[in-house]
């Protein structure tokens, strides 16, 4: 048996004339946090539904927990926990009723659910609220409860589909602490997200665009492999005008808006700084600060998507 929890080979899913997942291949090692990144509609959720046995592939193969998703879907489902984008909780049930319900779904006896109940309540921080209706909980509390319900049966692999969507930054950080605890206990965590800062928490990453994997590796490897030229962060007036001017220059490799700043990729740091300053100031745009920065995964994402798009139609997006 290999050291992989998940093995995917040429996985493809077609809906009519639309290819949602296009010959995707990757491995997920046991006990790691694996991030599947991409914009909305890139194919993340379709992939995760196939791996959970909720949707069949058009072609290709995959094994989850050592079992083939096509031939042995029931064996796969016994070994996984799944948390969907909408958390899949029943709003009109109380906290403990939701836990009991999902325990039954996963085949746990009533006695076993009672044994696990305190653990879920403690993990989710919901002691004293077990009789509260789920609809009365904040989004952050619902998120933690949904995770508790998904891992109630102690699965070896957990699939989390956009688990932090619509959650405030503090709740997001707390949720990732829970994910790290799971991974530290030997659970394999497969998480889809479009929050690129969250990908820094992952051991391994795949970036999917238009159904195809376009980049992969650890966060450090991806920055080193896909970003080879200096990136300058420019603080200036009239950011949009500045970006449009820079995009017309042959010596500018890539440019994107990041909040109130510009990120500009150039071939040479010193020469690039001089040219950026000269161009902008000649057009009446004051440059307040310009520094070379360590590239982020967002830089990788934007650069790879622009390269895949060909015409750079994502320039200026964040």
Label each residue range with its predicted role.
Residues 92, 133-140:
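Conserved ABC ATPase signature
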Residues 100, 104, 111-129:
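Conserved ABC ATPase "signature" region
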Residues 147:
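Hydrophobic anchor residue at the start of the ABC signature
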Residues 154:
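Conserved catalytic motifs of ABC-family nucleotide-binding domains
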Residues 158-161:
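Catalytic Walker B motif of ABC-type/P-loop ATPase nucleotide-binding domains
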Residues 177-191, 196-267:
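ABC transporter nucleotide-binding domain
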């Amino acid at each position: 048996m290999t050291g992989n929890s998940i093995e995917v080979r040429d996985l493809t899913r077609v809906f009519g004339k639309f290819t949602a997942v296009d010959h995707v291949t990757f491995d997920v090692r046991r006990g790691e946090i694996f991030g599947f990144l991409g914009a909305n509609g890139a194919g993340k959720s379709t992939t995760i539904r196939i791996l959970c046995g909720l949707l069949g592939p058009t072609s290709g193969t995959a094994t989850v927990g050592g079992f083939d998703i096509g031939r042995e879907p029931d064996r796969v489902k016994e070994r996984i926990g799944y948390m969907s984008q909408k958390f899949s909780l029943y709003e009109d049930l109380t906290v403990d009723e939701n836990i009991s319900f999902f325990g039954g779904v996963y085949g746990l006896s009533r006695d076993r659910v009672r044994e696990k109940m305190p653990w879920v309540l403690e993990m989710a921080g919901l002691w004293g609220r077990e009789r509260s209706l789920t609809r009365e909980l904040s989004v952050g509390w619902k998120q933690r409860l949904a995770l508790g319900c998904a891992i109630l049966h102690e699965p070896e692999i957990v699939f989390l589909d956009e688990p932090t969507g619509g959650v405030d930054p503090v709740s997001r950080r707390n949720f990732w602490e829970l994910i790290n605890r799971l991974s530290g206990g030997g659970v394999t965590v497969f998480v889809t997200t479009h929050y690129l800062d969250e990908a820094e928490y992952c051991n391994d990453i795949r970036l999917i665009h238009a159904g195809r994997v376009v980049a992969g590796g650890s966060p450090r490897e991806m920055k080193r492999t896909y970003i080879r030229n200096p990136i300058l962060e420019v603080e200036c007036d009239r950011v949009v005008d500045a970006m449009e001017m820079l995009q017309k220059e042959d010596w500018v490799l890539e440019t994107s808006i990041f909040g109130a700043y510009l990120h500009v990729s150039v071939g040479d740091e010193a020469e690039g700084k001089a040219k950026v300053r000269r161009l902008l100031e000649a057009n009446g745009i004051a440059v307040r600060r310009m520094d070379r920065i360590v590239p982020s995964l967002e830089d990788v994402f934007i650069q790879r998507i622009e390269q895949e798009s060909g015409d750079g139609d994502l320039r200026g997006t964040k």
